[in-house]
From Swiss-Prot:
Compartment annotation: Secreted
Stretches assigned to the Peptidase S8 domain: 135-412
Domain Inhibitor I9: 36-120
Protein name in the entry: Subtilisin-like protease 6
Protein's job: Secreted subtilisin-like serine protease with keratinolytic activity that contributes to pathogenicity.
Any GO BP: proteolysis
CDD domains on file: Peptidases_S8_PCSK9_ProteinaseK_like
Propeptide intervals in chain numbering: 21-127
Record Pfam families: Inhibitor_I9, Peptidase_S8
EC number: 3.4.21.-
Length: 412
């Protein structure tokens, strides 16, 4: 999996059904990881039954390893186990064809899909203001017409809200974060640093002091993509699980309450039922999740998590209120946000200019944090609030696509 600088267009098709369990195959453009799979349980499977299933799995794998000793390199078996909100239970790992066949025969299994590479998606009253904004997107989201250079916002600025950035990490020491950014979880390597830059740029738009929409928000880095901006779908889902648990108080409880948390996923890959179910579990937990629509100039229904209806899917606009030529579109898009030539932070200090729906999504995540700070209800319903506030501004938005551009309600 990677950021939405470029997401891989794909549709998962049912390959076969064995005793009720669907085995899915990736489309022709997916970068599948050899012998790696995600196994998703049926929604009515209890934690006790899930535990019994994984115990059976471990025992079966150990038995086969003993029989095969010395004959070939053994498969790694189960590597990750997921439980999101009691409604999404799954595991991932490395399995051979024979083991996949056995797993698929279990009644508790809903479907099995191949693991694949995911990439980042780059290509009022009492208001205060920021003049001569460093990035045009800030001014655009606080005024009804394009061309402004001032960002108008309430001084509450997202204080008391926590934003989880599921990406390449964050340079938490960057001066523009003012000590409000910290590391949450690293699922990639032993380096708590953003060696790519994508995550820091995204976080800067969400909540940088100078470059961000929610200038008082707390930021948490969840690293699921490597220095090249890539990672596995299974690893991304593990990061989603950690962030949801932390936001709900099940981890360190950074956000204290799910309704005071927002999340951003400026990444995507082929359409994945597993990813979409995990995203829905986050929404069902009462957490607002903004995601990038993707950069293939195609219908976003073919990408995940953009195709999940319960999240807030964001397409990219240009400085003159046009659709960015790379941006995905379609009925799953909820809103447009600035995404072309966006200036934000880079690791080590200073700034960088990037384009992509990766840059659009954090505008919506930051706006979500800002609105919660103003007292708006959090959770997935916040996307409806954002759509209601948005301006009908985008010219030629794409087939069957909204023309709504986000607006913070400043009255300007």
């Amino acid at each position: 999996m990677g950021f939405i600088t470029k997401a891989i267009p794909i549709v998962l098709a049912a390959l076969s059904t064995v005793n009720g369990a669907r085995i899915l195959e990736a489309g022709p453009h997916a970068e599948t990881i050899p012998n790696k799979y995600i196994v998703v349980m049926k929604k009515d499977v209890s934690e006790e039954s899930f535990s019994a299933h994984t115990t059976w799995l471990s025992q079966t794998l150990n038995s086969r390893l003993m029989r095969r000793a010395g004959s070939s390199k053994p498969m790694a078996g189960m590597q990750n186990k997921y439980s999101l909100g009691g409604i999404f239970r799954a595991y991932s790992g490395e399995f051979d064809d024979a083991m996949i066949k056995d797993i698929s025969s279990h009644d508790d299994v809903d479907f099995i899909e191949p693991d694949f590479v995911v990439r980042a998606t780059t290509n009022g009253t009492n208001l205060t203001h920021q003049d001569n904004v460093p990035s045009w997107g800030l001014a655009r989201v606080s005024t009804r017409k394009p061309g402004g250079t001032t960002y108008y916002y309430d001084p509450s600025a997202g204080k008391g809200v926590t934003a989880y950035v599921i990406d390449t990490g964050i340079d938490t020491k960057h001066e523009d974060f003012g000590g409000r950014a910290k590391w949450g979880k690293n699922l990639v390597d032993q380096m708590d640093e953003d060696c790519n830059g994508h995550g820091t740029h995204v976080a800067g738009t969400v909540g940088g002091t100078k470059y961000g929409l929610a200038k008082g928000v707390s930021l948490v880095a969840v690293k699921v993509l490597d220095c090249e901006g890539s990672g596995s779908n299974s690893g991304v889902i593990k990061g989603m699980e950690w962030a949801m648990m932390d936001a709900s108080g099940g981890g360190n409880g950074t956000a204290k309450a799910a309704g005071k948390a927002v999340m951003n996923m400026s990444l995507g890959g082929p359409r994945s039922e597993a990813t979409n179910q995990a995203a829905k579990a986050i929404s069902d937990a009462g957490i607002f999740l903004a995601v990038a629509a993707g950069n293939e100039n195609m219908d976003a229904q073919h990408s995940s998590p953009a195709s999940e209806p319960s999240v807030c899917t964001v397409a990219a606009s240009t400085k003159d209120d046009g659709k960015a030529n790379f941006s995905n579109f379609g009925s799953v898009v909820d809103v447009y946000a600035p995404g072309k030539d966006i200036v934000s932070l880079k690791p080590g200090g200073g700034t960088d200019t990037l384009s992509g729906t990766s840059m659009a999504s954090p505008h919506v995540c930051g706006l979500g944090a800002y609105l919660i700070g103003l007292g708006k209800q959090g959770g997935p319903g916040l996307c409806d609030t954002i759509k209601e506030m948005a301006n009908d501004a985008i010219q030629s938005p794409g087939e069957d696509t909204t023309s709504k551009l986000i607006y913070n309600g400043s009255g300007k």
